[in-house]
Swiss-Prot record:
InterPro entries: Beta_cellobiohydrolase, Beta_cellobiohydrolase_sf, Glyco_hydro_6_CS. Belongs to the glycosyl hydrolase 6 (cellulase B) family. Monomer. The keyword Hydrolase applies. The gene is cel6B. Pfam families: Glyco_hydro_6 (PF01341). This is Endoglucanase-6B. Its EC number is 3.2.1.4. One of its GO terms (biological process) is cellulose catabolic process. Plays a central role in the recycling of plant biomass. The biological conversion of cellulose to glucose generally requires three types of hydrolytic enzymes: (1) Endoglucanases which cut internal beta-1,4-glucosidic bonds; (2) Exocellobiohydrolases that cut the disaccharide cellobiose from the non-reducing end of the cellulose polymer chain; (3) Beta-1,4-glucosidases which hydrolyze the cellobiose and other short cello-oligosaccharides to glucose. It catalyses: Endohydrolysis of (1->4)-beta-D-glucosidic linkages in cellulose, lichenin and cereal beta-D-glucans. Keywords: Carbohydrate metabolism, Cellulose degradation, Glycosidase, Hydrolase, Polysaccharide degradation.
Amino acid sequence: QSGNPFSGRTLLVNSDYSSKLDQTRQAFLSRGDQTNAAKVKYVQEKVGTFYWISNIFLLRDIDVAIQNARAAKARGENPIVGLVLYNLPDRDCSAGESSGELKLSQNGLNRYKNEYVNPFAQKLKAASDVQFAVILEPDAIGNMVTGTSAFCRNARGPQQEAIGYAISQLQASHIHLYLDVANGGWLGWADKLEPTAQEVATILQKAGNNAKIRGFSSNVSNYNPYSTSNPPPYTSGSPSPDESRYATNIANAMRQRGLPTQFIIDQSRVALSGARSEWGQWCNVNPAGFGQPFTTNTNNPNVDAIVWVKPGGESDGQCGMGGAPAAGMWFDAYAQMLTQNAHDEIAR
């Protein structure tokens, strides 16, 4: 897996997300707001976003993504499909807004391997004509490093085994793996860098057989800027006040262990200045805007690409901005706000 897998490719548009944004575009059109309606249309047609395979039922969306990628290739495009592998048993053990369908106490580890990872891997291996970037288990390593509850501590060993298994099953030249390492606000502190590298080393050891990953993902579903010259006060004392610096710091910790050093960084949603009073605020942060769309021009040799992972407009949970629905449900008022505050590259 040498070379940047995103180089010369475009991140595939997520057709499911695009159709959800129809409601947002109509809301702007009904108010005669052509400017923001045009921005939504740009996101729908031009901005690639990862597909979330967050339970066993949603494995079918891999087939949709593969179909869409083949259609794009037939039109002369050169797509890479972004997928999020996210169904760890006892996942989100610390926050609980996104707990999943599998429980370690109910045969969750075996079910994860046999009913989720195996079919996931089979679908990707069968589509050897398509390039895939797969983010593995957002937030899991964050919880392993900092999760102090008995629930998180008990989940740690089996979860390491589970992620190692997923890595071992997804070894193929057209599959590029990025193990999630939370974000700079969570693991970017000086005393967290080394434990994070240790956790990664343990997981790769469990993957066995010289299993390879391309690197790491960060800021998935979070709101940190890619780079800033004016970091908010709550970052004071951290060597990782933005995600580019976080990537550099983690890369240095990984390099010392002979581990991979490349990153992809989610910029689907970025908090506006003053939106957060503390770094730990992660839920429907208000105000925020759509961030930098997909690019490989990252100004950081450790960053393969800036990507959109979280579909902006899907709620983080019943928290943050008023009126928020349950995690994953569509929150149109939020999508409208993201559009109004969108990055300059999104059509004006």
